[in-house]
């Protein structure tokens, strides 16, 4: 019980202490589409739909889970990861085993990231993992401070648009979930992004006609991209969005 209480305090600290501040310098609003865990449908449907519109996404992969089966989806295969990379999509880090970072030491976290990078380099060749997403959205303040040094950005699951001076240690997102993203909400969020010259990061998981609670249908993904492009918004992966906001990407 005490351990759980301490973990909750650490998690709240990670959320409320902005630790990697950067003032956005983008000239126009930005939208990024990201996929966590990467079910195989995010490859077969998600990536294919993005490519229909000339859009590239960021796919946060825990390579140790490739080819595994869960309660809601089958995880992408190593070959599919390689194809995503070869087609120009960004591969992001999601730890090796989709670990709960609140429960890991600094050494264990480093091993998770190193193993993931090493395996993805064997799969993809020259891939560089420069951006990270916290598995389950969980992170302690200590692990946040550790990971923000290793990666250009770390993304969570806290809802919101990234505007003005942002925390690159805990980027905000908007759920691209069929259960929660209505046309009215989409229009409101996109208008807010335009009004504040923001960076809107969508995140989802599976892309199927019967999505999980944390996934979306192909029609929702397609209509979202259509709406974004109709408003003239720039759609780029996280790595390219960082350049557009003026972050000194290597």
Segments and roles (model prediction):
Residues 56, 90, 153, 199, ...:
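Residue-level detector of anion-binding/catalytic polar loops
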Residues 193, 203-221, 238:
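C-terminal active-site rim and adjoining tail of enzyme catalytic domains
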Residues 45, 50, 69, 98-194, ...:
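Catalytic domains of cell-wall/extracellular-matrix polysaccharide-remodeling enzymes
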Residues 91-98:
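Histidine-centered catalytic micro-motifs
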Residues 32-35, 92, 203-204, 235:
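Generic enzyme active-site microenvironment
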């Amino acid at each position: 019980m005490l351990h759980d209480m301490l973990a909750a305090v650490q998690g709240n600290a990670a959320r409320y202490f902005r630790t990697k501040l950067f003032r956005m310098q983008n000239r126009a609003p930005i939208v990024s589409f990201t996929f966590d865990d990467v079910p195989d449908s995010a490859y077969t449907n998600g990536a294919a739909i993005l490519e229909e519109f000339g859009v590239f996404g960021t796919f946060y992969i825990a390579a140790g889970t490739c080819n595994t089966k869960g309660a809601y989806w089958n995880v992408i295969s190593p070959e599919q990861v390689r194809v995503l990379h070869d087609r120009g999509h960004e591969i992001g880090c999601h730890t090796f085993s989709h670990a709960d970072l609140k429960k890991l030491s600094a050494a264990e976290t480093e091993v998770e990231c190193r193993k993931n990078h090493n395996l993805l380099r064997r799969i993809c060749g020259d891939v560089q993992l420069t951006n990270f997403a916290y598995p389950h959205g969980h992170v302690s303040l200590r692990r946040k401070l550790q990971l923000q040094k290793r990666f250009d950005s770390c993304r969570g699951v806290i809802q919101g648009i990234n505007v003005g001076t942002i925390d690159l240690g805990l980027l905000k997102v908007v759920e691209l979930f069929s259960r929660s993203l209505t046309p009215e909400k989409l229009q409101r969020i996109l208008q807010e992004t335009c009004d504040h010259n923001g960076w809107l990061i969508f995140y989802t998981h599976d892309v199927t006609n019967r999505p999980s609670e944390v996934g979306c249908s192909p029609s929702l993904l397609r209509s979202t991209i259509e709406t974004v492009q109709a408003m003239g918004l720039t759609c780029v992966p996280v790595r390219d969005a960082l350049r557009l906001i003026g972050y000194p990407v290597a």
